[in-house]
Amino acid sequence: MNHMPAVRRFQAGDAPAATAIIRGLPDYFTDDVPAKVEHDAASHQAWVLTDSGTVAGFAVAATKSPSGAEILWIAIDATRRGRGHGTRLLSHVLNHLAADGISVVEAKTLDRSSGYRPYEATRAFWERNGFIHIDTIDPLPGWPPGNPAAIYVAAIRHSGSASGVLAVGPHWLA
């Protein structure tokens, strides 16, 4: 039976699965990240993507102002990458944020000036999903030295339709 991936709210019992996803992506996360994700998931809005009943990804978003939010974490299990799961999860998160009145979303990732190749796909993911690179901060407070942060933003809005379809990116501003 083919099960469609589903997104639901992160629950306390999902922390071990999130940790396993993080540990399975050693090129992307440092050893202190599982504790940070667990803390952030308990303190902010968080979701998991399940595939055939198994947690295959997670996302955490923090509301920064009445109209702004930041995607703090998003990750998909290494064995399930490239199947559209990240886009599905991000779309769900952005739709939820837009329905809550958020109009600008920020994401941070490792900047291309770092020369670290694994993050090329990460930056491409944000750009493919309507995010625009607006700045590089080095050093970013809280990040290890030598890890320039690429700051990405996207303008979002809820369509107002019953389906809640989201408009992302600069094209809807015209």
Q: Which role fits each region the language model picked out?
A:
Residues 97-118:
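Conserved GNAT acetyl-CoA-binding A-motif
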